[in-house]
Amino acid sequence: MKNWFGLAAYVTVAVALLWAPRSEPVRAQESHTRISLSSDWSHHHMVFSRPASWTEALRWQQNPRYIQQLVRRNVWRTGENGTDPYGWFLRRGEGELKRDWSQSMGSGATLGAGQYPAKFSFDVKSANCNSDFVAFHTGLAASTSQASIIAYSNLYVGCGGSVPTVYWAYDTGGTISTSVTLSQDGSQVAFVQAQAGVATLVVLKWKASASETASAPLKITNASTTGPGTVSNANYRACTAPCMTTITFNGNPTDTLSAPYYDFTRGSDVLYVGDDAGKLHEFTGVFSGTPAESGSPWPAIVASVKLSSPVYDSVSGNVFVTTSRQTSNNSGARFAAVCATSACAGVNAGNGTIAIGTATPSLVLGPTSTSTVACNGTGASGDTVDLRVDAPIVDSTAGKAYVFVGNNGNGSSAVYQFSTTVDSNHFAFHSCGATQATVGTGSTTGIPLFSGDFDNVYYSSASGASPTGNLYVCGNTSGNATLYQLRITSDALATSGTLVLAVSSANTTCSPVTESDTSSTDRIFLSVQANGATGAVACPVGAGCVMSFNVPTTLGGTLPTGTAATLGVSGGTSGIIIDNNVVPGTLRTSEIYFSTLTGSTAIQASQAGLQ
């Protein structure tokens, strides 16, 4: 609660920053209020374009995620001086994406493709060696010699001693395969683990330790009434850290793709997550009350196949989710809205009167053998393999959702744009969205198209709820992996992407794209699993590679002709988290955090001297 009021106090300054000229630094209030910030997978999928006016922005201050994005994107302009007094950040040459540290999480450990670490910053105005941390799940079965989740602190160059150090590491009694989510103050973690083959929600309070490691974690599965250990749901709120509580999903399903999405709105304390049986679950009392799964009409029936990670939009009241294609029943590759609040109830989108728990699905967006249920007919091949569909990106301000499909059933990779308003005139039952944009060829072997990201032209667009800018995505899933730019004009998506350049000389999978803006440079980061780009700056021959590109800072600017920086990584990377929250002044850096897909390591890499 204290951190919420800190964020609320910060919003006036943050809103002022939003309309400040880029060329003139804005100083925060002299009396410094500590603002903590959590960043996890969900902040990549729920975004906000710039509101149309100051007054509209002030109305958005009731949405904690909007404020978090303001802080995350504007904090580089709030440094209290222009020096680097502690030597935290060292200038590096342009093009040098330096691996600051890598840590083994155990043999075979990985976050997994399309999954993310989670970062907590104790104070967005300064680095904190003791309290800033980044958490990784390992994707391995927990045991006395293998952590299922591990966090690192002492993260930064200049912290002294061992960089980093293990902050805490736990044997939680299961296998965590999807991204974790953090409470707003960073003191708790929520995640899904497979426990005896069944999906289980875990809510955990951590405690810093000097003795735990990836190979010697603390076992907190022993039954307890007060902690440390596993406590009942009723005893969780009062338990002493480290402690956790577990809730088995209703129906005993599995969950291999869906990560939990937490609603930070005051008074909500609700979390949503999907399962492999096509149901969407709601949990209440997660970080502030008594954790419990909601009953009827939850879990909501969306489909009969695996769900992606859900994204809740507080404006429309809908939870948006995608379904992956499953060949066993010729189903999936759809986008769906599930009504979660009274805001979306009572209308008819072609499937009867919507109530809380009602799902409104699109037609099939990918390959299928049944043309009558598909947006593009049976088209090209690809209907004989399963196809994962990533979680959508939702721009709550603009009222649009973006869905990324590696095969649209007609021979192309595609990005679909949908309205977040569910009714017969916008997103209707069994519709195909407002626009379909193609980004190269479509995979017939099940290579997914992971989510892209918008550039700062889009995020800072002055056109309010009708933003103009660009969406970058790594497509061409049936050929050499290729970076594309998709133009968005007044909230309308172009129907085809502009080819930027090939990022691999092979038919390989890209990671999601992650954008990071500074006062003078807008960068995007992505990785390929093999045969990375060979132009300047070149990736190691034949290897997986993470790379950055300098993208135009103005509409219609010159597209990059090569990478800005590269780093060889084993088998490519997970999703990438950007840490733009430490601002020493004119010397600043972008930390990126990720895991390798085959090298068993957690990595922090930095690129400084951006100005």
Feature map (PLM): residue ranges:
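Bacterial N-terminal signal peptides
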Residues: 8-20
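Sec/Tat signal peptide C-region and signal peptidase I cleavage site
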Residues: 19-28
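Positively charged n-region of N-terminal signal peptides that target proteins for export
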Residues: 1-4
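Mobile, glycine-rich extracellular loop/lid and propeptide segments
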Residues: 31, 54, 63, 69-611
